Regions:
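Conserved SGNH/GDSL esterase-like catalytic core that processes O-acyl groups on lipids
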Residues: 1-49, 91, 234-237, 242-251, ...
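Structural beta-strand segments of beta-rich domains
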Residues: 159, 167-171
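Structural recognition of the beta-strand scaffold that forms the well-ordered cores
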Residues: 24-30, 66-71, 107-110, 127, ...
């Protein structure tokens, strides 16, 4: 991006072709090469000016064009210069890109989020492979069309789930851009609108333990999701090493193994699947909330 940096985009033939094409949609994803020590330390003060000038050149070529500015894709920790300045310069640029989008009146597209926890999709620590490119393509498609696949909630939401008592309850998910999302639970009704990135959140008032079960309903004009037998209670997160992998069914103590389980206890078992990086969600269809009994407590 930097006009005095390493291989400036404005000096490439691709830039001249883009101007001559004068497209209606302009998607800009530049800046990674500007983390080069030949660029950022010397010319970083020009970054905002050069970026705004680039946007203006496309608007001059086509005054009716719409512009999307992209937060940069990740740089993995395996990059040879990651700890020698590149990491810090990368985050400086990301902050400036967000400000540039605001100043220019352009729409911001986040290309970092989808690959941030997937270094396995960046073979050279910088460029995505085919699967990573597919994630970027879907992100850009959603930003341009507003189509994020309709109403969706994380897999942790299911029938029989337990919501933490006496705490405000954030309910979050994805819907198509601009869709109105309505959430109802225990006499409460909250509404919001999905943002340009498809994300939405509403916060419900705290629930007290009452012994009652509820239906959580989340809806848009095109889809409705109902989660039944939802209760308020204490939610405990159990994780760790081999001690948490030990199953009750494998205990030698038959008395403990065969002890009746109170039916008020509910379990959400995240079945382990090997991954190269931490995941924000899981896709195992067997991970759902269940009421504990002899058939599942030993698993």
């Amino acid at each position: 991006l930097l006009n005095k940096g390493y291989r400036p985009y404005t000096q490439q033939e691709a830039y001249q072709k883009a101007l001559r094409f004068a497209g209606d949609y302009v998607i800009i994803h530049l800046g990674l090469n500007d983390t080069d020590p030949r660029a950022w330390p010397n010319y970083r003060d020009d970054f905002v000016r050069d970026y705004l000038s680039l946007i203006e050149s496309f608007r001059k070529a086509n005054p009716r064009c719409k512009v999307w500015v992209c937060r940069m894709t990740p740089i993995s920790h395996r990059h040879p210069r990651f700890k020698s300045g590149t990491r810090d310069w990368y985050w400086m640029e990301q902050a400036l890109i967000e400000e540039i989008a605001r100043i220019a009146g352009a729409t911001l597209v986040d290309l970092q989020e989808g690959l941030y926890d997937r270094p396995d999709l960046l073979p050279d620590a910088l460029h995505p492979n085919a699967e990573g490119a597919g994630i970027l393509a879907r992100t850009v498609y959603g930003a341009l069309t507003g189509d994020y696949g309709g109403l969706q909630l994380p897999a942790i939401y299911s029938d029989r789930m337990v919501l933490q008592r006496d705490q405000p309850l954030p309910i979050s998910g994805i819907a198509n851009q601009g869709e109105k999302v309505t959430v109802t639970l225990a006499g409460q009704r909250k509404e919001t609108v999905a943002g340009t990135n498809g994300k939405w959140t509403v916060t419900l008032d705290p629930l007290r333990v009452s012994g009652k079960s509820y239906t959580l309903t989340v809806s848009t004009p095109s889809r409705t999701l109902n989660y039944r037998d939802v209760v308020a209670g204490e939610v405990w997160l159990c994780s760790g090493q081999s001690n948490m992998l030990m199953q009750v069914g494998g205990l030698k103590d038959k008395t403990l193994r065969n002890t009746p389980v109170p039916d008020q206890i509910r379990l959400f078992h995240v079945w382990t699947e090997p991954t190269a990086a931490p995941q924000e969600d899981f896709k195992n269809a067997y991970s759902v909330w269940v009421k504990t009994d002899a058939s599942n407590i030993g698993q």
